[in-house]
Amino acid sequence: MIWFLAFILFLAAGELVSSSGLLNCEPSEIAYEEITRQGQKSTNTLCKCKYEPYKFSTATSKDKTTVTVQYKCKQVRPCVYGQKCQSLEDGPQEKALKTHCTCAKGQQCHSTPEHADESRIFGDTKYYSFVCV
């Protein structure tokens, strides 16, 4: 009976450590790194995002055999739209693929690249994210 209780406590302690082993990230901290070494990808998690994580790369370093990309936690902005990369010099309204805005009543989303607080390229599309004003 004592061995059984000790085993249960051991399992509970292991679960507690594994679920709370990482501290919450501060906004300026690197949350995790993706390391690609000779085609093999691994992740080094440094802290836990409080919110649903959004891949926001902050730095990329390369040497002969390794590429390391560092990511921070970031909340998705309320207004996002995408453009095909070959049309970035054109006005964003003419070439917008999809606009997704959830601004509060009475607010609107800035919709020009100069007002973007962030832009990301995935494939052949550049996505801008904006704050509501």
UniProtKB/Swiss-Prot annotation:
Signal peptide, first to last residue: 1-19
Q: Where is the major localization of this protein?
A: secreted
**Where does it live in the cell?**
Secreted
Chloroplast is among the record's keywords: no
> Transmembrane helix as a keyword?
no
Q: Which domain of life is it from?
A: Eukaryota
Q: Which family does it belong to?
A: Belongs to the scoloptoxin-11 family.
Task: Say which species the protein is native to.
Answer: Scolopendra morsitans
Disulfides per UniProt: none
Name the tissues where it is expressed: Expressed by the venom gland.
The GO molecular function terms of this record are: toxin activity
Q: What is the lineage of its organism?
A: Eukaryota, Metazoa, Ecdysozoa, Arthropoda, Myriapoda
Q: Which UniProt keywords apply?
A: Disulfide bond, Secreted, Signal, Toxin
GO CC list: extracellular region
What protein name is recorded for this chain? U-scoloptoxin(11)-Sm1a
Q: How is it modified after translation?
A: Contains 10 disulfide bonds.
